From Swiss-Prot:
Protein name according to UniProt: Urokinase-type plasminogen activator
Subcellular location, record wording: Secreted
Entry similarity comment: Belongs to the peptidase S1 family.
GO process annotations (BP): fibrinolysis; plasminogen activation; regulation of cell adhesion mediated by integrin
Cystine pairings recorded for this chain: 31-39, 33-51, 53-62, 70-151, 91-133, 122-146, 168-299, 209-225, 217-288, 313-382, 345-361, 372-400
Quaternary data: Found in high and low molecular mass forms. Each consists of two chains, A and B. The high molecular mass form contains a long chain A which is cleaved to yield a short chain A. Forms heterodimer with SERPINA5. Binds LRP1B; binding is followed by internalization and degradation. Interacts with MRC2. Interacts with PLAUR. In complex with SERPINE1, interacts with PLAUR/uPAR. Interacts with SORL1 and LRP1, either alone or in complex with SERPINE1; these interactions are abolished in the presence of LRPAP1/RAP. The ternary complex composed of PLAUR-PLAU-PAI1 also interacts with SORLA.
Record organism: Pongo abelii (Sumatran orangutan)
Enzyme Commission number, as recorded: 3.4.21.73
Any one GO molecular function term: serine-type endopeptidase activity
Chain positions covered by the region annotation Connecting peptide: 152-178
Modes of activity regulation: Inhibited by SERPINA5. Inhibited by SERPINE1.
Gene: PLAU
Chief place where the protein resides: secreted
Domain EGF-like: residue ranges: 27-63
Length: 431
């Protein structure tokens, strides 16, 4: 009973003192306070210290900038409160049991410097292209980009910007080798990606296939995407688009002036032969594509010059997560596969003689990620001599991410003469 009375008396003293002017005492002890925060303690518990933060900051060390609504650069020093991914899913807390098993978490020795703590706010501790967080997807946490915009997108330049030019294979975000499997991305990471849609009689529009911008006026895709509806008037093309059915800042919309399908295209039970198409595009104003941080051309390879087998390459698209899915994902996805030799791909338990020298095979060594329905026509890009190069066009395959059934791609280096003969603008192509 005496112990209980003593505790009650202590509580009364603390509460009464907190109403006075001497509740907090600034102390020289190091609390690691940031952004002008001061280290303080209570009069009766001088061995307990914490940070007293300026108005716009919060967190244990005043490390959270409550006023920050956008990120600068790649967001490495972003300390705002965005806490959802681009699909609107909540981020996991950096100190949650699930995240503590990952590489970046709140218990790291450098967590404070990286902005990680007892919160679920988006951060960029590993210098990726923008802030991200861990999101629970199924049974495991996945790295996902965050719903927070670049401060530069909302700034008006004080002086006229330099004229932008197309520089094939260059992207504002650094190459990342980490669409069954894979991860969500934004168009800045694949600025040559073209989203192709088909108009219907009732006025509705549906996504058909992907494509790649090879010059300001030309997109290359796969013939099988258009063979059933070959009228150019049926199609529209978007460049600079990250989301399937909603607007992306800076995107451009184009009509199809000319649709060229390969005259020798054919399809077997499974394989597609000469599966390549060209779309000449123009806007309502009659202009071709204009370069920006979200719109860029992809380099074309030289004749028969393909990366060596085993090279890691990127595939991009709005393809389904699984072949049995009904809907396409709303956000653009990207993943990495490795090129497979023709000899291996022509093995009987792979595809046998269905694979020809006009095709390339690529797959994830663990068979966990692959192109899938809806990725057709999209790019397979590989780094070649320091530039991202269009090595293949998504064409066909059995299922999605099935063991011993890699994705098969149209071999772009084989079709260079065909591309040049139809575009008639070799100097304007991204060679």
């Amino acid at each position: 009973m005496r112990a209980l009375l003593a505790r009650l008396l202590l509580c009364v003293l603390v509460v009464s003192d907190s109403k006075g002017s001497n509740e907090l005492h600034q102390v020289p002890s190091n609390c690691d306070c940031l952004n002008g925060g001061t280290c303080v303690s209570n009069k009766y518990f001088s061995n307990i210290h914490w940070c007293n933060c300026p108005k716009k900051f919060g967190g244990q060390h005043c490390e959270i900038d409550k006023s920050k609504t956008c990120y600068e650069g790649n967001g490495h020093f972003y300390r705002g409160k965005a806490s959802t991914d681009t699909m609107g899913r909540p981020c996991l807390a950096w100190n949650s049991a699930t995240v503590l098993q990952q590489t970046y978490h709140a218990h790291r020795s450098d967590a404070l410097q990286l902005g990680l703590g007892k919160h679920n706010y988006c951060r960029n501790p590993d210098n990726r292209w923008r802030p991200w967080c861990y999101v629970q997807v199924g049974l495991k946490p996945l790295v996902q980009e965050c719903m927070v915009h670049d401060c530069a997108d909302g700034k008006k330049p004080s002086s006229p910007p330099e004229e932008l030019k197309f520089q094939c294979g260059q992207k504002t975000l650094r190459p990342r080798f980490k669409i069954v499997g894979g991860e969500f991305t934004t168009i800045e990471n694949q600025p040559w990606f073209a989203a192709i849609y088909r108009r219907h009689r009732g006025g509705s529009v549906t996504y058909v296939c992907g494509g790649s911008l090879i010059s300001p006026c030309w997109v290359v895709s796969a013939t099988h995407c258009f063979i059933d509806y070959p009228k150019k008037e049926d199609y529209i093309v978007y460049l600079g688009r990250s989301r399937l059915n909603s607007h992306t800042q800076g995107e451009m919309k184009f009509e199809v002036e000319n649709l060229i399908l390969h005259k020798d295209y054919s399809a077997d039970t499974l394989a597609h032969h000469n599966d390549i198409a060209l779309l000449k595009i123009h806007s309502k104003e009659g202009r071709c594509a204009q370069p920006s941080r979200t719109i860029q051309t992809i380099c074309l390879p030289s004749m028969y010059n393909d990366p060596p087998f085993g090279t890691s390459c990127e595939i991009t698209g709005f393809g389904k997560e699984n072949s049995t899915d009904y809907l396409y994902p709303e956000q653009l996805k990207m993943t990495v596969v490795k090129l497979i030799s023709h000899r291996e791909c022509q093995q009987p338990h792979y595809y046998g003689s269905e694979v020809t020298t006009k095709m390339l095979c690529a797959a994830d060594p663990q068979w966990k990620t692959d192109s899938c329905q809806g990725d057709s026509g999209g790019p397979l890009v590989c780094s070649l001599q320091g530039r991202m190069t269009l090595t293949g066009i998504v064409s066909w395959g059995r299922g999605c991410a099935l063991k011993d059934k890699p994705g098969v791609y149209t071999r772009v280096s084989y079709f260079l003469p065909w591309i040049r003969s139809h575009t008639k603008e070799e100097n304007g192509l991204a060679l």
